[in-house]
Protein backbone atom coordinates (compact mmCIF):
# COMPACT_ATOMS: atom_id res chain seq x y z
CA UNK A 1 0.00 0.00 0.00
CA UNK A 2 2.87 2.38 0.75
CA UNK A 3 3.67 2.99 -2.90
CA UNK A 4 0.11 2.99 -4.24
CA UNK A 5 -1.49 6.24 -5.45
CA UNK A 6 -4.15 7.64 -3.17
CA UNK A 7 -6.25 10.72 -2.60
CA UNK A 8 -6.14 13.18 0.27
CA UNK A 9 -9.52 14.89 0.11
CA UNK A 10 -9.27 16.59 -3.32
CA UNK A 11 -5.51 16.00 -3.75
CA UNK A 12 -4.25 13.12 -5.88
CA UNK A 13 -1.03 11.71 -4.42
CA UNK A 14 1.42 9.43 -6.22
CA UNK A 15 1.99 7.34 -3.07
CA UNK A 16 1.26 7.27 0.67
CA UNK A 17 4.73 8.44 1.70
CA UNK A 18 4.81 11.87 3.36
CA UNK A 19 7.93 13.96 3.87
CA UNK A 20 7.76 15.24 7.43
CA UNK A 21 8.36 18.90 8.28
CA UNK A 22 11.97 19.48 9.34
CA UNK A 23 13.68 22.73 10.28
CA UNK A 24 16.76 23.27 8.10
CA UNK A 25 17.57 26.97 8.74
CA UNK A 26 18.48 27.95 5.16
CA UNK A 27 16.32 31.11 4.88
CA UNK A 28 19.40 33.28 5.32
CA UNK A 29 18.11 36.63 4.02
CA UNK A 30 15.23 38.18 5.97
CA UNK A 31 13.71 34.76 6.71
CA UNK A 32 12.84 34.49 3.03
CA UNK A 33 12.85 31.24 1.00
CA UNK A 34 15.31 31.07 -1.88
CA UNK A 35 16.43 29.09 -4.92
CA UNK A 36 18.49 26.69 -2.79
CA UNK A 37 15.40 25.78 -0.80
CA UNK A 38 13.45 25.28 -4.02
CA UNK A 39 16.12 22.85 -5.22
CA UNK A 40 16.02 20.95 -1.92
CA UNK A 41 12.27 20.40 -1.97
CA UNK A 42 12.18 19.60 -5.70
CA UNK A 43 14.78 16.87 -5.14
CA UNK A 44 12.32 15.23 -2.73
CA UNK A 45 9.18 15.60 -4.86
CA UNK A 46 8.91 11.83 -5.20
CA UNK A 47 7.06 11.86 -1.89
CA UNK A 48 3.31 11.63 -2.19
CA UNK A 49 3.10 14.77 -0.07
CA UNK A 50 5.77 17.16 1.17
CA UNK A 51 5.17 19.12 4.37
CA UNK A 52 7.59 22.03 4.57
CA UNK A 53 9.71 23.02 7.52
CA UNK A 54 7.99 25.09 10.19
CA UNK A 55 7.31 28.57 8.83
CA UNK A 56 6.27 31.50 10.97
CA UNK A 57 3.06 33.41 10.22
CA UNK A 58 4.42 36.31 12.28
CA UNK A 59 7.66 38.21 12.92
CA UNK A 60 7.13 37.29 16.59
CA UNK A 61 7.20 33.58 15.76
CA UNK A 62 10.69 33.39 14.24
CA UNK A 63 12.29 31.95 17.36
CA UNK A 64 15.09 30.02 15.64
CA UNK A 65 17.90 31.39 13.49
CA UNK A 66 17.20 31.54 9.76
CA UNK A 67 13.82 29.80 9.74
CA UNK A 68 11.44 31.01 7.03
CA UNK A 69 8.41 33.19 7.46
CA UNK A 70 5.27 33.77 5.43
CA UNK A 71 3.80 37.13 6.33
CA UNK A 72 4.93 39.45 3.53
CA UNK A 73 5.07 39.61 -0.26
CA UNK A 74 8.78 38.84 -0.62
CA UNK A 75 8.44 35.68 1.46
CA UNK A 76 5.43 34.64 -0.61
CA UNK A 77 7.48 35.15 -3.77
CA UNK A 78 10.26 33.03 -2.30
CA UNK A 79 7.84 30.25 -1.48
CA UNK A 80 6.44 30.45 -5.03
CA UNK A 81 9.90 29.35 -6.22
CA UNK A 82 9.51 26.27 -4.02
CA UNK A 83 5.97 25.33 -5.02
CA UNK A 84 6.70 25.83 -8.72
CA UNK A 85 9.77 23.59 -8.47
CA UNK A 86 7.88 20.83 -6.64
CA UNK A 87 4.88 20.98 -8.94
CA UNK A 88 7.17 20.84 -11.98
CA UNK A 89 8.31 17.44 -10.70
CA UNK A 90 4.71 16.29 -10.22
CA UNK A 91 4.76 16.61 -6.44
CA UNK A 92 2.30 17.99 -3.92
CA UNK A 93 3.32 20.31 -1.10
CA UNK A 94 1.72 21.93 1.94
CA UNK A 95 3.34 24.50 4.21
CA UNK A 96 3.62 24.02 7.94
CA UNK A 97 2.78 27.20 9.83
CA UNK A 98 4.69 27.28 13.12
CA UNK A 99 4.70 30.15 15.60
CA UNK A 100 7.48 29.39 18.09
CA UNK A 101 5.96 31.41 20.95
CA UNK A 102 8.24 31.22 23.98
CA UNK A 103 10.67 28.83 22.24
CA UNK A 104 12.70 31.82 21.16
CA UNK A 105 15.47 34.30 21.69
CA UNK A 106 15.11 37.98 20.91
CA UNK A 107 18.37 37.92 18.92
CA UNK A 108 16.72 35.63 16.36
CA UNK A 109 13.75 37.95 15.81
CA UNK A 110 13.60 40.83 13.32
CA UNK A 111 13.68 44.40 14.58
CA UNK A 112 10.48 45.37 16.37
CA UNK A 113 9.37 41.80 17.07
CA UNK A 114 8.96 40.36 20.57
CA UNK A 115 8.78 37.00 22.29
CA UNK A 116 5.24 36.13 23.39
CA UNK A 117 3.57 33.15 25.03
CA UNK A 118 0.49 32.07 26.98
CA UNK A 119 2.19 33.26 30.19
CA UNK A 120 5.42 35.01 31.15
CA UNK A 121 7.03 31.72 32.22
CA UNK A 122 10.48 31.31 30.65
CA UNK A 123 11.34 28.07 28.87
CA UNK A 124 14.29 26.41 30.65
CA UNK A 125 17.47 25.83 28.70
CA UNK A 126 19.26 27.57 25.86
CA UNK A 127 18.99 28.06 22.12
CA UNK A 128 21.40 29.00 19.35
CA UNK A 129 21.61 32.51 17.93
CA UNK A 130 23.80 33.55 15.00
CA UNK A 131 24.87 36.77 16.71
CA UNK A 132 25.47 35.62 20.30
CA UNK A 133 25.92 31.86 20.14
CA UNK A 134 24.05 29.80 22.74
CA UNK A 135 21.79 31.90 24.94
CA UNK A 136 19.10 31.25 27.58
CA UNK A 137 15.60 31.51 26.14
CA UNK A 138 14.19 35.02 26.27
CA UNK A 139 11.39 35.83 28.69
CA UNK A 140 8.05 35.95 26.86
CA UNK A 141 5.38 38.58 27.36
CA UNK A 142 2.09 37.01 28.41
CA UNK A 143 -0.41 37.36 25.57
CA UNK A 144 -3.46 39.56 26.10
CA UNK A 145 -6.80 39.00 24.40
CA UNK A 146 -5.72 41.54 21.78
CA UNK A 147 -2.50 39.59 21.22
CA UNK A 148 -4.42 36.36 20.80
CA UNK A 149 -6.81 37.92 18.31
CA UNK A 150 -3.85 39.35 16.41
CA UNK A 151 -2.03 36.01 16.20
CA UNK A 152 -5.18 34.24 15.03
CA UNK A 153 -5.50 36.86 12.29
CA UNK A 154 -1.81 36.40 11.40
CA UNK A 155 -2.35 32.67 10.90
CA UNK A 156 -5.31 33.30 8.60
CA UNK A 157 -3.42 35.92 6.58
CA UNK A 158 -0.40 33.63 6.25
CA UNK A 159 -2.59 30.78 5.07
CA UNK A 160 -4.04 33.04 2.39
CA UNK A 161 -0.52 33.95 1.26
CA UNK A 162 0.31 30.24 1.15
CA UNK A 163 -2.49 29.51 -1.28
CA UNK A 164 -1.50 32.51 -3.39
CA UNK A 165 2.08 31.19 -3.39
CA UNK A 166 0.87 27.91 -4.89
CA UNK A 167 0.73 25.59 -1.90
CA UNK A 168 -1.72 22.69 -2.02
CA UNK A 169 -2.65 23.28 1.60
CA UNK A 170 -1.49 24.32 5.06
CA UNK A 171 -0.50 22.32 8.13
CA UNK A 172 -0.83 23.98 11.53
CA UNK A 173 1.92 22.90 13.93
CA UNK A 174 0.21 21.95 17.17
CA UNK A 175 3.08 19.89 18.60
CA UNK A 176 6.71 20.11 19.82
CA UNK A 177 6.00 22.76 22.43
CA UNK A 178 5.45 25.68 20.06
CA UNK A 179 2.74 28.29 20.51
CA UNK A 180 -0.35 26.20 19.78
CA UNK A 181 0.85 23.41 22.08
CA UNK A 182 1.90 25.96 24.68
CA UNK A 183 -1.82 26.71 25.00
CA UNK A 184 -2.83 23.02 24.74
CA UNK A 185 -0.43 21.67 27.32
CA UNK A 186 -1.50 21.66 30.96
CA UNK A 187 2.09 21.85 32.20
CA UNK A 188 2.77 25.04 30.25
CA UNK A 189 -0.59 26.80 30.14
CA UNK A 190 -1.23 28.25 33.59
CA UNK A 191 -3.70 30.89 32.42
CA UNK A 192 -6.78 31.48 34.55
CA UNK A 193 -8.94 33.13 31.88
CA UNK A 194 -10.97 31.50 29.10
CA UNK A 195 -7.80 30.19 27.43
CA UNK A 196 -6.72 28.01 30.36
CA UNK A 197 -7.86 26.36 33.55
CA UNK A 198 -9.77 23.52 31.89
CA UNK A 199 -9.52 21.17 28.93
CA UNK A 200 -11.93 23.33 26.94
CA UNK A 201 -9.99 26.46 27.84
CA UNK A 202 -6.66 24.96 26.80
CA UNK A 203 -8.18 23.77 23.50
CA UNK A 204 -9.69 27.16 22.73
CA UNK A 205 -6.70 28.87 21.08
CA UNK A 206 -5.99 25.92 18.78
CA UNK A 207 -9.61 25.78 17.68
CA UNK A 208 -9.75 29.53 17.08
CA UNK A 209 -6.67 29.31 14.85
CA UNK A 210 -8.02 26.31 12.95
CA UNK A 211 -11.43 27.89 12.39
CA UNK A 212 -9.94 31.20 11.24
CA UNK A 213 -7.64 29.47 8.75
CA UNK A 214 -10.40 27.15 7.54
CA UNK A 215 -12.71 30.11 7.03
CA UNK A 216 -10.05 31.89 4.98
CA UNK A 217 -8.86 29.08 2.67
CA UNK A 218 -11.37 26.25 3.17
CA UNK A 219 -11.25 23.45 5.73
CA UNK A 220 -10.31 20.94 3.04
CA UNK A 221 -6.96 22.68 2.64
CA UNK A 222 -6.04 22.65 6.35
CA UNK A 223 -4.25 19.90 8.28
CA UNK A 224 -2.94 19.93 11.84
CA UNK A 225 -0.08 18.14 13.60
CA UNK A 226 -0.47 17.09 17.24
CA UNK A 227 1.50 15.04 19.74
CA UNK A 228 -0.19 14.34 23.06
CA UNK A 229 2.41 12.87 25.42
CA UNK A 230 5.18 14.68 23.53
CA UNK A 231 7.95 16.07 25.73
CA UNK A 232 9.68 18.62 23.51
CA UNK A 233 10.26 22.08 24.96
CA UNK A 234 9.09 21.32 28.50
CA UNK A 235 5.66 19.95 27.61
CA UNK A 236 5.00 16.34 28.65
CA UNK A 237 1.86 14.46 29.72
CA UNK A 238 -0.51 16.07 32.22
CA UNK A 239 -3.65 15.04 34.08
CA UNK A 240 -6.48 14.47 31.62
CA UNK A 241 -4.31 14.75 28.51
CA UNK A 242 -5.99 11.87 26.66
CA UNK A 243 -9.53 13.08 27.32
CA UNK A 244 -8.59 16.62 26.34
CA UNK A 245 -7.07 15.57 23.03
CA UNK A 246 -9.97 13.29 22.14
CA UNK A 247 -12.33 16.22 22.72
CA UNK A 248 -10.09 18.47 20.63
CA UNK A 249 -9.87 16.01 17.75
CA UNK A 250 -13.63 15.44 17.72
CA UNK A 251 -14.08 19.19 17.23
CA UNK A 252 -11.38 19.24 14.55
CA UNK A 253 -13.07 16.34 12.79
CA UNK A 254 -16.37 18.22 12.68
CA UNK A 255 -14.64 21.09 10.86
CA UNK A 256 -13.73 18.74 7.98
CA UNK A 257 -9.97 19.22 7.86
CA UNK A 258 -7.60 17.93 5.19
CA UNK A 259 -5.93 15.57 7.67
CA UNK A 260 -4.80 14.92 11.24
CA UNK A 261 -1.05 14.31 11.66
CA UNK A 262 0.01 12.40 14.80
CA UNK A 263 3.66 12.54 15.85
CA UNK A 264 5.63 10.10 18.03
CA UNK A 265 9.25 11.01 18.86
CA UNK A 266 10.21 7.73 20.54
CA UNK A 267 12.60 6.90 17.70
CA UNK A 268 14.57 9.98 18.77
CA UNK A 269 14.72 8.94 22.41
CA UNK A 270 11.49 10.44 23.76
CA UNK A 271 8.91 8.32 25.57
CA UNK A 272 6.54 6.54 23.20
CA UNK A 273 3.06 7.92 22.68
CA UNK A 274 0.76 5.23 24.13
CA UNK A 275 -0.93 3.09 21.50
CA UNK A 276 -4.28 3.72 23.15
CA UNK A 277 -4.32 7.46 22.51
CA UNK A 278 -3.14 6.97 18.93
CA UNK A 279 -6.06 4.62 18.35
CA UNK A 280 -8.47 6.94 20.16
CA UNK A 281 -7.49 9.91 17.99
CA UNK A 282 -7.71 7.74 14.88
CA UNK A 283 -11.25 6.82 15.90
CA UNK A 284 -12.20 10.40 16.81
CA UNK A 285 -11.03 11.92 13.52
CA UNK A 286 -13.29 11.05 10.60
CA UNK A 287 -10.80 11.92 7.89
CA UNK A 288 -7.30 11.17 6.57
CA UNK A 289 -4.83 10.27 9.32
CA UNK A 290 -1.03 10.58 9.03
CA UNK A 291 1.34 8.85 11.46
CA UNK A 292 4.96 9.97 11.90
CA UNK A 293 7.79 8.62 14.00
CA UNK A 294 10.68 6.29 13.19
CA UNK A 295 9.08 4.29 10.38
CA UNK A 296 10.97 2.09 7.92
CA UNK A 297 9.43 0.35 4.93
CA UNK A 298 8.11 -2.65 6.87
CA UNK A 299 6.63 -0.72 9.78
CA UNK A 300 5.15 1.88 7.45
CA UNK A 301 3.48 -0.83 5.40
CA UNK A 302 2.19 -2.47 8.58
CA UNK A 303 0.67 0.81 9.79
CA UNK A 304 -1.23 1.13 6.52
CA UNK A 305 -2.29 -2.51 6.25
CA UNK A 306 -3.59 -2.54 9.83
CA UNK A 307 -5.59 0.64 9.35
CA UNK A 308 -3.57 2.58 11.91
CA UNK A 309 -2.89 5.28 9.31
CA UNK A 310 -3.83 6.38 5.82
CA UNK A 311 -0.41 7.87 5.10
CA UNK A 312 3.00 7.46 6.76
CA UNK A 313 5.46 10.30 7.29
CA UNK A 314 9.24 9.95 7.15
CA UNK A 315 11.59 12.64 8.44
CA UNK A 316 15.36 12.32 8.74
CA UNK A 317 15.68 9.63 6.04
CA UNK A 318 14.52 12.27 3.54
CA UNK A 319 17.37 14.59 4.55
CA UNK A 320 20.09 12.30 3.22
CA UNK A 321 18.03 10.33 0.70
CA UNK A 322 16.28 12.71 -1.70
CA UNK A 323 15.07 9.64 -3.63
CA UNK A 324 13.78 7.97 -0.47
CA UNK A 325 10.60 6.61 -2.03
CA UNK A 326 12.51 4.77 -4.76
CA UNK A 327 15.08 3.50 -2.27
CA UNK A 328 12.33 2.09 -0.06
CA UNK A 329 10.58 0.58 -3.05
CA UNK A 330 13.76 -1.13 -4.33
CA UNK A 331 15.24 -1.93 -0.89
CA UNK A 332 18.30 0.18 -1.63
CA UNK A 333 20.46 0.97 1.41
CA UNK A 334 19.86 4.39 2.94
CA UNK A 335 22.55 7.03 3.30
CA UNK A 336 23.07 8.23 6.88
CA UNK A 337 22.61 11.97 7.44
CA UNK A 338 25.34 14.37 8.53
CA UNK A 339 23.97 15.78 11.78
CA UNK A 340 26.51 18.62 11.77
CA UNK A 341 24.84 20.23 8.73
CA UNK A 342 21.19 19.95 9.78
CA UNK A 343 20.92 23.67 10.59
CA UNK A 344 23.91 25.26 8.86
CA UNK A 345 23.51 27.67 5.94
CA UNK A 346 24.50 26.58 2.45
CA UNK A 347 24.24 23.55 0.17
CA UNK A 348 26.50 21.20 2.13
CA UNK A 349 24.40 18.54 3.80
CA UNK A 350 21.31 20.01 2.13
CA UNK A 351 21.21 19.58 -1.64
CA UNK A 352 24.41 17.56 -2.17
CA UNK A 353 23.19 14.09 -1.13
CA UNK A 354 23.43 11.65 -4.03
CA UNK A 355 20.54 9.93 -5.79
CA UNK A 356 21.16 6.18 -6.02
CA UNK A 357 18.06 4.88 -7.78
CA UNK A 358 17.92 6.79 -11.06
Locations of regions flagged by a protein language model:
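Flavin-dependent oxidoreductase catalytic cores
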Residues: 1-358
